[in-house]
C-alpha cells in the first residue's frame, strides 16, 4: 500500500531528477510563449527538405547556405514539432520547435551535473546545476535558439559520454600505472618487447610474408604522398580503355557501362578520374597504416593489446554513443570536431597507447554519422567537408552592436567575449567564476592529481577565445556563438561555490547562501519572460542600462507580442508591414491579415511592426502613431505603429 509513496520519496532524494522534472514542467508551461526567430522558418524548411532527400527528393540541394552547417537538428525538430502540433493543435509548429529546444537545454542541464561531479561533491554539483539552469541567457536561448542551444547540448553530451567511455576502457584495459609520460614510455617499451618476442617466434616464411606486406603498404603510402605512379597508371589505363586498346575484361566492363563513350571527350573522363583519385587519396593515407597495424598484430601475439586492438574495446557502448553524438555535433556546427579533440585527449590520457584502436572506431563512426545526416556531403564527402570547414573558419563578417556602436565582427576588441560574459551572466555567477578560478589554482598547487581535468576546462574556454582574438573567428549577436563554452565557466563557478560551502558550518547557512546565489537569476527569469535571453546584469544597469549600448532582442522574438496585439485590435483584412522577417510573424498572425515587408511603401500599410535593433525609425512624418511598445524597463524591443485617420476635408463655403 505504501510502495508508490516510498518510491516517490526515493526519487525525490535525487536532486538532479527534481531539477529535470521542474524543468520539464516549466517547458510545458512556457513552451508556447516565445516568438519565432528571424531564421527559424528558413531552418525549418531546410530540415523538411533534408528529410525528403531520403525518399529521393532533390529539393534540399536547391537551397542556399548548404555548406554552413548540416540539417540533423533541423530534421529532428521538424519531426517533433509536427508530433507536438498533432497532440496540442493550439500550439503552432513554431511552439513545437521551442519546446524541442527546451528539451535540448534540459539535456545540457543533466550533462552539466554529470560533468560537475568530476570536480566537486554532490551537494555543490546540484547547486551549481541550479545556478546554470537559472541563467537567463541560457534559459532564454534554451527555448528560441535552434543552432547554438543544440550545439551546446550535443557538445557537452559528447564530452560526458566520451569521458565515461574512457574511464570504462581504462578499467578494462589496465594500462601501466604511474603518471602519464612515464606510463606512456613504459607502454612503448612493452610494445617493442612484444614486437621483438613475436618476431623471434616467427618462422622464416612468415617473417618474409609480414615484411613483404608491410613493405608493400609503405610503398603505397609513399606513392600516394609523393611519387604518384598509381595516379599516372590509372590515367594511362583510362586512356587505353577510351581508345579500345585495354585488356578485354576491362574493355568489356567499360563498354557495358559507358555505351556512348564516344560522345564524351577523354578529358572529361580524366577529370572525373582526377576527382575520384583526390577523394580516395586522403582516406587511404589513414587506412594503410591501420591495415599495417592490424596485419602486424595478427602475426605478432600481444602487439594488438598495446594499441587497444581488442573486442572488449570495440564493444564499449558509451564509446559508440559518444561517436554518434560527435557526428551529430559536427553536423550542427563544424566546430564540433573540437569536442572530438577533447574526448581524444582524455582517452589518450586514460588509456595511452590502448586508445589508438578505440579512437579509430570513434572518429570513423562519428564521420559516418555526419555523412549520413548531411546530404550536402553525399556527392563528394571529403572535399565538401573540407570546403565547409574552410568556409566556417573564414565565415563572412557580420555587423554587431557593441559598446554603443556598430562594428564588424572581424574588428571586435579582444575583450569582446570576456566583457559580454561578465555582463550577460548573473552577478553571483561572475563572482563565483573568479572565486572558483582562484580555488582551482590553489587546489592544483596543493595536489596535481587532477591537473588534466582542469586542463580540459581551460582548453574548452581557451581555444575558442584564442580563435576570436588571434584568428578572427566570427562572433556576433553578443556571445550566442560561444554558448557552448559557458558550461565550463559555470563549472568553475561551482568550484567557487564548493569552496564557500566548505566554510559554512550550518545547513541553514548553506541554504541561505544558495538562495542568494540563485534568486537574481530566478527574478530575472520572471521579470523578463519571455525575453530572458536579452538579460544584462547590474554591471551595465540591467537591460535598461544596456539599451542603446548592446544588442538585446537581435532575434526579434518580441514581434510575436506586437502581432498578437494587432490580432486583438485590427479590423478584418488590414495590411500589416513588418520591418524584419515576415516569417517570424506568420505563425501568430490572424489569417485575414495581409502581411507585407519594407519593400512596399509605408502608405500601403495600416499597421507597422518595428523591431528596434535593426530599424530605429520615426514613422510620425509618414502619418503613423505609436500605440503599443514591447518593452522591459527602459528597453524598447518592438514598436507597433498605426496609421492615423485622415483629417476630414473642410466643408465648402455656402
Briefly describe each language-model feature range.
Residues 13-16, 124, 207-208, 314-318, ...:
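Membrane-interfacial loop-to-transmembrane alpha-helix junctions, especially the N-terminal start
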Residues 14-18, 91, 112-134, 305-317, ...:
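Transmembrane-helix signature of polytopic, membrane-embedded enzymes
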Residues 43, 51-56, 69-75, 79, ...:
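Transmembrane-lumen/periplasm boundary regions of multi-pass, lipid-linked membrane glycan transferases
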Residues 71, 75, 79, 87-110, ...:
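Loop-to-helix entry region of an early transmembrane alpha helix in multi-pass inner-membrane enzymes
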Residues 99-119, 157, 161, 295-298:
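Transmembrane-helix motifs of polytopic, lipid-linked glycan transferases
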Residues 128-133, 140, 160, 326, ...:
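Short helix- or helix-capping micro-motifs
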Residues 141, 148-156, 329-341, 423-432, ...:
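Hydrophobic/aromatic-rich transmembrane helices and adjacent perimembrane loops
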Residues 259-269, 543-654:
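C-terminal luminal/periplasmic domains and tails of membrane-associated envelope-modifying transferases
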Amino acid at each position: 500500500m505504501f510502495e508508490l509513496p516510498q518510491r516517490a520519496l526515493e526519487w525525490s532524494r535525487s536532486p538532479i531528477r527534481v531539477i529535470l522534472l521542474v524543468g520539464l514542467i516549466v517547458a510545458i508551461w512556457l513552451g508556447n510563449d516565445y516568438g519565432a526567430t528571424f531564421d527559424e522558418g528558413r531552418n525549418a524548411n531546410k530540415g523538411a527538405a533534408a528529410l525528403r532527400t531520403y525518399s529521393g527528393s532533390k529539393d534540399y540541394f536547391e537551397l542556399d547556405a548548404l555548406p554552413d552547417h548540416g540539417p540533423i537538428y533541423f530534421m529532428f525538430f521538424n519531426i517533433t514539432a509536427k508530433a507536438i502540433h498533432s497532440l496540442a493543435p493550439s500550439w503552432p509548429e513554431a511552439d513545437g520547435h521551442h519546446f524541442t529546444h527546451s528539451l535540448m537545454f534540459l539535456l545540457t542541464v543533466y550533462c552539466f551535473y554529470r560533468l560537475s561531479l568530476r570536480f566537486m561533491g554532490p551537494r555543490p554539483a546540484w547547486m551549481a546545476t541550479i545556478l546554470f539552469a537559472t541563467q537567463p541567457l541560457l534559459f532564454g536561448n534554451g527555448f528560441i535558439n535552434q543552432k547554438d542551444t543544440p550545439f551546446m547540448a550535443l557538445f557537452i553530451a559528447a564530452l560526458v559520454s566520451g569521458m565515461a567511455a574512457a574511464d570504462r576502457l581504462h578499467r578494462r584495459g589496465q594500462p601501466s600505472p604511474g603518471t602519464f609520460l612515464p606510463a606512456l614510455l613504459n607502454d612503448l617499451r612493452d610494445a617493442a618487447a612484444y614486437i621483438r618476442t613475436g618476431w623471434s617466434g616467427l618462422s622464416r616464411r612468415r617473417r618474409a610474408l609480414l615484411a613483404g606486406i608491410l613493405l608493400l603498404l609503405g610503398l603505397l603510402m609513399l606513392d600516394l604522398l609523393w611519387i604518384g605512379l598509381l595516379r599516372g597508371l590509372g590515367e594511362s589505363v583510362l586512356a587505353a580503355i577510351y581508345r579500345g586498346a585495354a585488356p578485354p575484361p576491362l574493355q568489356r566492363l567499360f563498354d557495358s557501362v559507358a555505351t556512348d563513350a564516344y560522345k564524351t571527350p577523354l578529358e572529361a573522363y580524366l577529370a572525373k578520374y582526377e576527382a575520384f583519385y583526390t577523394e580516395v587519396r586522403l582516406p587511404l593515407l589513414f587506412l594503410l597504416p591501420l591495415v599495417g597495424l592490424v596485419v602486424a598484430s595478427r602475426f605478432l601475439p600481444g602487439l594488438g593489446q598495446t594499441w587497444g586492438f581488442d573486442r572488449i574495446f570495440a564493444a564499449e557502448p558509451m564509446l559508440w554513443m559518444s561517436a554518434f553524438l560527435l557526428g551529430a555535433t559536427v553536423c550542427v556546427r563544424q566546430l564540433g570536431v573540437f569536442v572530438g579533440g577533447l574526448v581524444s585527449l582524455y582517452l589518450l590520457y586514460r588509456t595511452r597507447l590502448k586508445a589508438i584502436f578505440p579512437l579509430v572506431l570513434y572518429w570513423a563512426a562519428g564521420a559516418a554519422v555526419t555523412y549520413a545526416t548531411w546530404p550536402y556531403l553525399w556527392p563528394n564527402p571529403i572535399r565538401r567537408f573540407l570546403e565547409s570547414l574552410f568556409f566556417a573558419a573564414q565565415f563572412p563578417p557580420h555587423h554587431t552592436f557593441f559598446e554603443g556602436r556598430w562594428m564588424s565582427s572581424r574588428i571586435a576588441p579582444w575583450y569582446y567575449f570576456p566583457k559580454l560574459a561578465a555582463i550577460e551572466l548573473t552577478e553571483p555567477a561572475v563572482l563565483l567564476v573568479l572565486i572558483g578560478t582562484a580555488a582551482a589554482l590553489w587546489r592544483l598547487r596543493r595536489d596535481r592529481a587532477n591537473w588534466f581535468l582542469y586542463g580540459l576546462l581551460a582548453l574548452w574556454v581557451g581555444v575558442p577565445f584564442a580563435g576570436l582574438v588571434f584568428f578572427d573567428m566570427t562572433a556576433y549577436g553578443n556571445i550566442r556563438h560561444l554558448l557552448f563554452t559557458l558550461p565550463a565557466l559555470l563549472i568553475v563557478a561551482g568550484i567557487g561555490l564548493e569552496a564557500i560551502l566548505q566554510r559554512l558550518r550550518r545547513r541553514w547557512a548553506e541554504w541561505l547562501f544558495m538562495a542568494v546565489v540563485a534568486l537574481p537569476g530566478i527574478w530575472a527569469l520572471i521579470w523578463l519572460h519571455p525575453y530572458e535571453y536579452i538579460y544584462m546584469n547590474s554591471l551595465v544597469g540591467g537591460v535598461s542600462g544596456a539599451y542603446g549600448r548592446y544588442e538585446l532582442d537581435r532575434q526579434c522574438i518580441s514581434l510575436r507580442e506586437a502581432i498578437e496585439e494587432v490580432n486583438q485590435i485590427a479590423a478584418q483584412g488590414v495590411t500589416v508591414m513588418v520591418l524584419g522577417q515576415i516569417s517570424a510573424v506568420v505563425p501568430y498572425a490572424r489569417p485575414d491579415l495581409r502581411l507585407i515587408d519594407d519593400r512596399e511603401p509605408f502608405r500601403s500599410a495600416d499597421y507597422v511592426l518595428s523591431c528596434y535593433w535593426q530599424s530605429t525609425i520615426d514613422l510620425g512624418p509618414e502619418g503613423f502613431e505609436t500605440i503599443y511598445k514591447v518593452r522591459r524597463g527602459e528597453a524598447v524591443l518592438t514598436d507597433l505603429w498605426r496609421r492615423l485617420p485622415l483629417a476630414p476635408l473642410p466643408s465648402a463655403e455656402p
